[in-house]
A protein has these predicted regions:
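Long, Pro/Ser/Thr-rich low-complexity/intrinsically disordered regulatory tracts in eukaryotic proteins
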Residues: 26-28, 48, 71
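Short, surface-exposed loop/turn motifs at beta-strand boundaries within globular domains
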Residues: 28, 34-36
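Anion-binding (especially nucleotide phosphate/pyrophosphate-binding) glycine-rich loop
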Residues: 34, 66-180, 184
Length: 184
């Protein structure tokens, strides 16, 4: 049987997916952009901001951003490609994937997919529609394909330093700063 938390997570996911919108005005307007972000240390209240707990009890968390040996260890680089494809490359996980059709990019439900986070970013930012369309149409509109490199340097998974959430933020920030989402 599934617990209340699982039911709640499915409801939140379903609501989020319903509310995603495809941004038909997005364009690639620069050739390459890199985002580097710091890590996060939780000083108090950890997990009290996580549903369903925070919905029932409220939540307050105190975090601080930190550098690792003076460096921002979470990095995402987006680079425009002339080819009609999307490439994901996770250097720290040593995985590489190339996509020339849209359906695999729209499939974000597999928690073991090494690119689930990157795919979710493209859906959440409106770069890829949640259903339908073709990758050729999307990339024609954007002005080309692109490669997304990601890397978390010298930080083990599960360290408690926020690498997954910060990598998510870096992906979104890189998409916006590459001006895939061009706001006129």
């Amino acid at each position: 049987s599934r617990g209340l938390g699982d039911v709640y997570k499915r409801q939140v996911l379903a609501t989020t997916l319903r509310n995603l919108s495809y941004n038909e005005n997005a364009r690639i307007v620069t050739e390459k952009h890199t985002v580097k972000l710091p890590l996060r240390v939780n000083w108090g209240g950890g997990w009290s901001d996580t549903p369903p707990y925070c919905n029932e009890n409220g939540g307050t968390v105190l975090n601080v951003a930190i550098l690792l040996n003076g460096q921002k260890p979470v990095e995402v680089t987006l680079e425009k490609l002339s080819e009609k494809k999307i490439v994901f490359d996770s250097r720290d996980m040593d995985v590489h994937g190339e996509f020339d059709t849209i359906e695999p990019l729209q499939a974000t439900g597999d928690p073991f997919d090494p690119f689930a986070l990157q795919k979710a970013c493209l859906l959440a930012c409106g770069i890829i529609p949640k259903e339908g369309s073709s990758l050729d149409e999307v990339l024609d509109r954007l002005g080309g394909g692109f490669e997304m490199h990601s890397e978390v340097t010298n930080v083990p998974k599960g360290s408690g330093l926020g690498t997954s959430s910060i990598l998510s933020a870096a992906c979104v920030k890189a998409v916006f700063e590459l001006s895939l989402i061009h706001i006129s």
